[in-house]
């Protein structure tokens, strides 16, 4: 982190192996750098420079929920939106765009899908959660830009892409 930078950095860790055992090992490693990581302890969140959010294999949830002190948070799904799990455990709601929306950027977004998207974002934000979708169109072109535009207009917090330069051009063109 930069010496005079006071923002937050989200480290999204995508577990591709068995979640519970991988998370337990990761937790041991995060403890070595406890001064860097946002921490949940006994019902309270203490912010720090880096907030680790665990994504990927869902089995990581069980050991995480059992911890009274942890240096990582859980990446929820749309099914978690409105659940009893608080934002102090699930600060991020992520899901597969293609499984939840039929619109892929061709023509205007159907009004019902725009309303659904905005409802998801509104509900999450009221709960103190951020929103991200993966599996959005990611080939350069008008379809991708149309989807990104709708995501921004709806207030989605994270745009998921493998084309960082393309995203930067898109955001720069919109003064973001």
Regions flagged by a language model, labelled:
Residues 1-176:
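Catalytic cores of phosphodiester-bond hydrolases, prominently lipid phosphodiesterases
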């Amino acid at each position: 982190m930069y010496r005079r930078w006071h923002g937050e950095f989200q480290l999204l860790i995508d577990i591709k192996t068995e979640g519970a055992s991988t998370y337990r090992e990761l937790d041991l490693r995060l403890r070595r750098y406890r001064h860097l990581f946002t921490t949940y302890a006994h019902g309270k969140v203490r912010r720090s420079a880096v907030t680790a959010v665990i994504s990927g294999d869902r089995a990581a949830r069980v050991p995480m929920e059992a911890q009274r002190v942890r240096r990582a948070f859980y990446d929820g799904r749309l099914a978690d939106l409105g659940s009893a799990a608080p934002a102090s455990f699930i600060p991020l709601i992520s899901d597969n765009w293609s499984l939840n929306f039929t619109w892929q950027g061709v023509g205007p977004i159907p009004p019902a899908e725009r309303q659904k998207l905005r409802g998801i974002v509104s509900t999450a934000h009221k709960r103190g959660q951020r929103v991200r979708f993966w599996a959005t169109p990611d080939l350069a072109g008008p379809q991708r830009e149309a989807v990104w535009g709708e995501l921004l207009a709806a207030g989605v917090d994270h745009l998921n892409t493998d084309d960082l330069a393309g995203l930067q051009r898109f955001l720069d063109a919109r003064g973001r």
